[in-house]
Regions:
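N-terminal winged-helix
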Residues: 29-30, 77, 87-115, 119-123, ...
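Short beta-strand-centered segments that line the small-molecule binding cleft or hinge
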Residues: 106-110, 128-165, 169, 178, ...
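Hydrophobic hinge/microswitch elements
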Residues: 126-139, 145, 195-254
Length: 299
């Protein structure tokens, strides 16, 4: 099996066809076809099939695709590691959840002092988006909540700081003077997580208080959309208390200080267990860890 075969296979899958893959790689279509057929012959399996919408991987092809992406990512990291020796170049890609994004400015500033020429890519999203990108090595690491991720031997988790949930609403909300969850149970709510997600705030807040989870809950997997709904409607939601206090959100959102204790959660760093970070990615990870200590003291 040659690296060029893996490259060609990935190009076909990502482009959706032989012609598009050939154009992307700057080679002829027959060359791509021979390469993929040779790979299939070596693996004794058909990896690709034509459909009305384009070329897609077969079941064996999907299994090989996951490994091929990891192999390509490992090769790219190996090349970067060699380039980085004795130089201050290279690249790092990492993900942050909205809560953990608070420490990015401090972390990047520290990192730039050591690697001013390195390429940095930052992805923001919820854990269900970021964690798969760590698994397939699209991201070097991700900073997000622990509880929403099922145990996985491929991932390592390093706790960084604890955060607290708060009930939030828009300023001037008719329920802003409520002081118990019971007084909010009939309101409309928005959730960034599925209600049955491990460690989610709804069950952990309402059940200990002897209350049922609110019936009117909209699940919204977009952080910006959720913030817009909270700011422009009478919906309620659970957000990080520290995020509300340290960001511009406090200009148009406020906390409802209910009497019941609300759950907290751990934010930490997810990395792959079988792949060491490159020199540059490791330096960024260390900068994030240092920046997180400020949040840990403020929590």
């Amino acid at each position: 099996m040659r690296l060029s075969q893996i490259r060609d296979f990935l190009a076909v899958v990502e482009s959706g066809g032989i012609r598009a893959a050939a154009r992307k790689l700057g080679v002829s279509q027959p060359a791509i076809t021979r390469s993929v057929r040779g790979l299939e012959a070596e693996l004794h399996a058909r990896l690709l099939q034509r459909t009305p919408t384009g070329v897609v991987p077969t079941l064996p092809g999907r299994a090989f695709l996951a490994r091929a992406r990891v192999a390509q990512a490992e090769l790219r990291k190996a090349e970067e590691e060699v380039d980085q020796l004795g130089q201050r170049v290279g690249s790092v890609a990492f993900g942050v959840s909205p809560t953990s994004a608070m420490m990015v400015p401090e972390a990047v500033s520290r990192f730039r002092q050591q690697f001013p020429q390195a390429r940095v890519r930052i992805a923001e999203g919820l854990p269900n988006l970021l964690i798969p990108l760590v698994r397939d090595e699209t991201l070097d690491f991700a900073i997000c909540r622990q509880a929403v991720v099922k145990p996985d031997s491929a991932l390592a988790f390093r706790p960084l700081f604890r955060n607290d949930f708060a009930v939030v609403c828009r300023r001037g909300h008719p329920l802003e003077k409520a002081r118990s969850l019971a007084g909010l149970a009939e309101a409309s709510w928005i959730s960034l997580l599925p209600l049955d997600a491990p460690g989610g705030p709804f069950d952990r807040a309402f059940s200990p208080a002897g209350l049922s989870v609110p019936k009117q809950v909209i699940q919204c997997e977009s952080y910006n959309t959720a913030i817009g709904l909270l700011a422009k409607t009478d919906m309620l939601g659970f957000l990080s208390r520290q995020l509300l206090a340290e960001s511009i959100l406090r200009d148009f959102l406020q906390q409802i200080p209910v009497a019941e204790p609300l759950p907290s959660f751990i934010v930490g760093m997810f990395t792959r267990t079988d792949t060491p970070l490159t020199q540059v990615a490791g330096a960024m990870a260390k900068s994030v860890i240092v920046a997180s200590r400020v949040l840990a003291r403020a929590a």
